[in-house]
UniProtKB/Swiss-Prot annotation:
Protein name as it appears in the record: Large ribosomal subunit protein bL20c
Subcellular location: Plastid, Chloroplast
Predominant subcellular localization, coarse grouping: plastid
PROSITE patterns found in the cross-reference section: RIBOSOMAL_L20
Organism: Gossypium barbadense (Sea Island cotton)
NCBIfam families for this protein: rplT_bact (TIGR01032)
Keywords associated with the record: Chloroplast, Plastid, Ribonucleoprotein, Ribosomal protein, RNA-binding, rRNA-binding
Length: 128
């Protein structure tokens, strides 16, 4: 059987993996077998948390909007605001509403008051 000269293929592969794990602590950045395990684990976490980040930010935006909106009226809440926005066909997503709530509360108060006034007028006309 003839000799096969592979050069430095294995070293190159291990070097690439160790560069990925160079910021890990202890054996996770030194031992090849644990590096590969930690690399798989890190990539799984990154993949999972990309989806989770979207959920977390949506929850944060909803919390911010709700906190500001509850200051408007006793019986007014986030769900009523979103319902009224949909009825009026206003295209403001939760991210924009949260930015308005943080930076300029008066603007959000004005939006919610206008929506509520028009909603109250329609309801009073329907009762008559």
């Amino acid at each position: 059987m003839t000799r096969i000269k592979r050069g430095y293929i294995a070293r190159r592969r291990r070097k690439k993996i160790s560069l990925f794990a160079s910021s890990f602590r202890g054996a996770h950045s030194r031992l090849t077998r644990t590096i590969t395990q930690q690399r798989i684990r890190a990539l799984v976490s990154a993949h999972r948390d990309r989806d989770r980040k979207k959920r977390d930010f949506r929850r944060l935006w909803i919390t911010r909007i709700n906190a500001v909106i509850r200051g408007v009226g006793v019986s007014y809440s986030y769900s009523r605001l979103i319902h009224n926005l949909y009825k009026k066909q206003l295209l403001l997503n939760r991210k924009i509403l949260a930015q308005i709530a943080i930076s300029n509360r008066n603007c959000l108060y004005m939006i919610s008051n206008e929506i509520r006034k028009e909603g109250d007028r329609k309801e009073s006309n329907e009762m008559l």
